Structure formats: C-alpha cells, structure tokens
C-alpha cells in the first residue's frame, strides 16, 4: 500500500520515473547516477557504505550529523551536513544544493574523485600495505631494543 502511494506521488511530482524498491547490485551505479543528491537521514549507521557508493557515483551527499552514525565523516563541506532529526535543516540543505546547480555539479565531481582516492579497493590496499609495513617496522624496532 505504501509503495503504491509513493509511486503515485513520485509520478505526480517528479520529472522522471522514480525507482522504488530493491535493485540488483549491477543496476545500482546507473540508478545512483540518475539522482541529483544522496540524502542520508539515518540516526544510526555503522558503516555508511551507501554514502560511499553514492559519492563514487558522483552524488553530493546530504548527511544527518548523528553521534550514532559514521556517515558524517564523509562530508567535505558544511552544506553536506544537517543536524539529525531536524527536517527544516535538511530541507534547507537540499534547497541550497538545488539552488546552486553549478556547485552541485562541481562538488559531485569532487566527491567522486575523493571517494576514488580514499575509499576504492586500490586505496584500501595501499593503506593496508602501509599499515602492514608500519607494523613490521615497529616489531623489528621492538626486537632491536629488547
């Protein structure tokens, strides 16, 4: 019942069809790229993978700043954060991005590049190798000083 209600509302309000429901992993990059913003109003979120996926697709995130969520760490500017449970602040953030399409486009590219540099598989491997080398060096220093 709610799904049908949302679909009718989306058909009336949106200029392009809304995709409500579950989607295959292979469909997600294109689906994400079809959006304008990634709104992440979660109160609690430990990993925030959806935020990283959206950013990788070039979406600017609008993230709830919550002590129970890791998502806020991904915001690169104040316009990407709003206080959790503050719907008026959320609306202001969305409106800001909609009212500044050049900034939205520019920051979509910045978020995508930032995600590639810091959260891609290649970036994760580089960080892991650096951490492993540091641990080996620390262990070698402990043995020398023992």
Question: Residues of each region from the PLM?
Answer:
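Nucleotide-activated donor-binding/catalytic signature segment of Leloir-type glycosyltransferases, i.e.
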Residues: 4-23
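Short alpha-helical donor nucleotide-sugar binding micro-motif in glycosyltransferases
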Residues: 22-23, 30-35
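Short alpha-helical segment that forms part of, or immediately flanks, the ligand-binding pocket
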Residues: 29, 47, 51-56, 70-72
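A short hydrophobic beta-strand element within the catalytic core of glycosyltransferases
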Residues: 38-39
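Aromatic "clamp/platform" in nucleotide-sugar-dependent glycosyltransferases that forms part
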Residues: 43
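Short hydrophobic beta-strand element within catalytic cores of glycosyltransferases
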Residues: 60-65, 69
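Conserved acidic donor-binding segment of nucleotide-sugar-dependent glycosyltransferases
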Residues: 76-87, 96-101
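A charged, aromatic-enriched C-terminal amphipathic alpha-helix characteristic of glycosyltransferases
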Residues: 102-134, 139
């Amino acid at each position: 019942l709610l799904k049908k209600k949302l679909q009718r509302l989306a058909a009336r309000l949106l200029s392009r069809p809304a995709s409500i429901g579950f989607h295959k992993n292979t469909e997600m990059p294109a689906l994400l790229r079809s959006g304008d913003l990634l709104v992440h109003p979660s109160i609690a979120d430990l990993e925030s993978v959806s935020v990283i996926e959206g950013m990788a697709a070039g979406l600017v995130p609008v993230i709830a700043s919550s002590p129970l969520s890791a998502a806020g760490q991904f915001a690169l500017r104040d316009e990407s954060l709003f206080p959790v449970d503050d719907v008026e602040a959320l609306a202001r953030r969305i409106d800001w991005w909609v009212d500044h399409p050049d900034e939205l486009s520019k920051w979509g590219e910045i978020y995508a590049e930032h995600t590639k540099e810091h959260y891609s598989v290649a970036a994760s491997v580089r960080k892991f190798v650096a951490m492993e080398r540091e641990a080996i060096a620390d262990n070698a220093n402990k043995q020398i000083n023992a």
